[in-house]
A protein has these predicted regions:
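Glycine-rich beta-alpha loop elements in corrinoid/cobalamin-binding modules
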Residues: 32, 36-165
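A cross-family glycoside hydrolase active-site/sugar-binding cleft signature
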Residues: 8, 76, 102-104, 199, ...
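Glycine- and acidic-residue-enriched helix-capping/strand-helix junction motifs
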Residues: 17-33
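Alpha-helix N-cap and loop-to-helix initiation/capping positions
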Residues: 24-28, 128, 222-230
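N-terminal [4Fe-4S]-dependent radical SAM core
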Residues: 11-20, 142-200
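Extreme N-terminal starter segment of soluble prokaryotic enzymes
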Residues: 2-5
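Radical SAM [4Fe-4S] cluster-binding motif and immediate context
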Residues: 167-248
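Short loop/turn segments at strand-loop or loop-helix junctions that form parts
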Residues: 8-12, 213
Length: 248
């Protein structure tokens, strides 16, 4: 549709820059961004990724962002990513003042009032974004600017949305020397590559004090599961596309 969209994964709080393959948490995809990418690409939008874990520092980020020259950037934000996400947003507006900035993810949903105070943010998407984010992109592509900054996500039918766009990460990683023939870094040695993680549902039947309140904010209290046929179809796709040997 002519609109260039760059998604940003700011996950450098743990292992820092140049950290691809430096442990399991530096070799997994963000299913949130991968799902948003799949939904946006299904509607014809040009989507690419900047994964801060693959870069060498903020100057490198500036260079890559200037090369991509996006019309829209989308930043996912967990609370641990708060500082690098803020910095990425500030640099994005510095590099291209006209870029439309969108943030979403767990921190935005759970700490909305705090997120509203983050500078350089045009729109905030709470909850699940597979319906809301492409809708925003369609409006922007038509020259419209939604009047409200906060856009409430709508829970999608999990069998109706596209499978996670793992190539969003894999193609980006390979630009920076990722040479493992696997969509993701295996969790343990007993899970041989090619390896991938799969999300079979949203919400949780348990009541752990650490993550359950956040799950409820993001996905609601009801557990939603994909059908067995839908999960098997994704597994078959992963075997055909990546010769999948193990998954979790």
């Amino acid at each position: 549709m002519g609109l260039k969209v760059t998604l940003i994964y700011p996950g450098i709080a743990g292992r820092g820059w140049n950290s691809l393959k430096q442990g399991m948490d530096a070799g997994w995809i963000s299913h949130g961004l991968a799902s948003l990418s799949a939904a946006a690409k299904a509607e014809g939008f040009d989507v690419n990724l900047i994964d801060l874990r693959a870069l060498s520092g903020w100057d490198h980020f500036r260079e890559v962002l200037a090369e991509r020259d996006p019309d829209v950037i989308g930043v996912t934000m967990m609370s641990v990513d708060y500082n690098p996400a803020r910095q990425a947003l500030a640099i994005a507006k510095e590099v291209k003042p006209t870029v439309v900035t969108v943030i979403g993810g767990p921190h935005v949903t759970i700490a909305l009032q705090d997120s509203l105070r983050i500078p350089h943010v045009d729109y905030l998407v709470t909850g699940e974004g597979e319906i809301t984010f492409p809708r925003l992109l369609r409006a922007l592509a038509q020259g419209e600017r939604p009047p409200y900054r906060v856009l409430r996500g709508e829970p999608p039918d999990l069998d109706a949305i596209p499978f996670s766009d793992r190539d969003l990460f894999l193609e980006e990683w390979k630009k920076w020397g990722y040479d493992l023939d696997s969509p993701e870094v295996p969790f343990v040695e007993e899970l041989p590559p090619p390896f991938a993680t799969i999300i079979a549902g949203r919400g949780c039947i348990y009541n752990c004090t650490f993550c359950k309140p956040g799950e409820d904010y993001l996905f609601g209290k009801r557990v939603r599961r994909r059908s067995v046929d839908n999960v098997l179809a994704e597994l078959r796709m992963l075997v055909d596309r990546y010769h999948l040997a193990s998954f979790m």
